[in-house]
Amino acid sequence: MSRRALLRDGMLASGLMLGAPLLAACGKGNTAGPAKAGAMGAGSLRLLWVENVEFAGSYIADTNGYYKAEGFSSFTLISGGPTATPVETDLVAGKALFGISTPDLVASAVVRGGAGIKIIGAQFQKTPFALVSMADKPITTPQDMIGKKIGVQAISEPVWAAFLKANHINPNSVTKVPVQFDPLPLTTGVVDGWVGYITDEPIVLRSKGFKVVTFLFADHGYPLVGDAYVVSDKTIKEHRDAVKAFLHAQIRGWKEALADPALGARLAVEKYGKNLGLNVAVQTQESKTQNTLVLTDDTKKNGLFTMTPELIAENIAALKLGGINMTAGQIFDLSLLTEVYQENPSLV
């Protein structure tokens, strides 16, 4: 099932409910020293997708009580999925205090939907979008796609078009084959390549015995970040300490997820996604793979979720390739994360 199709279609269908009240009550202003128990009020995080290992750090933060340690009286992880409204809609409607989304979806909500929201950090320093091909007929660079048949789901077409543009490839030089959600056409030779997620199709195919090769779009001219943390402008203005407390808890959770990839996988399989029929081996491999998107040379130096000015500029340029023109200030506010690390240098 295409998560991006469901996410994008949901946004188009529901629209953005602007001006609704914020759901959770949080402490205002700046505080010094440890957070008082419950001072931040009730918190909630709307996940981008169903409760698989993608959100390992949040599961660990919740299980180990890091949200409460940062001053939240309670904290709820709200699942996404096939029937969920868009994250952006839930944020501006006050149904969730924090959310996880992608820059293109957030940018569209801001520019085309008028949403007052900002990205405050990036879980994945690189988008998981990847080109998957069979090992016996490998496609290892964008130029290798010329003359080939590439399976593209309908909802991935904007990303596909932007990726071709970034690599100066004439769309007519590649045969785009409309596909659904199952990558079976790749294994049977119907297509030569498949546009998917590095944390999804390749792992599933390998678990079934297929040998595949991949390359990330982010390594070839389309450097969007992924799983961005998003919050409303209203929350940033009125509950800044709560936002910083959330980021602090997330950092703690993800540090443990990086140290033990199997931990988040077990929590996904046995607790948070226990009704999804997840496979612990597949989830563990996904955890290991996604950790390479979380921990980079820059985040090792500057801290998890940070974005360098260069990376922000590259994201704005990539969004323009997809027809969304905006400035960095319209979509990014990394000042809260900067403050978290300034106040807690041991977190880096």
Q: Predicted regions: what is each one?
A:
Residues 1-17, 21:
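N-terminal secretory signal peptides and thylakoid transit peptides that target proteins
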Residues 17, 33-179, 184-188, 192-196, ...:
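Short, glycine-/small- and polar/acidic-enriched structural segments
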Residues 27-29:
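Bacterial signal peptide processing site
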Residues 137, 182-277:
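Pocket-lining segment of extracytoplasmic ligand-binding domains
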Residues 239-322:
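Secondary-structure end/capping motifs
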Residues 309-348:
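Conserved C-terminal helix/tail region of periplasmic/extracytoplasmic solute-binding proteins
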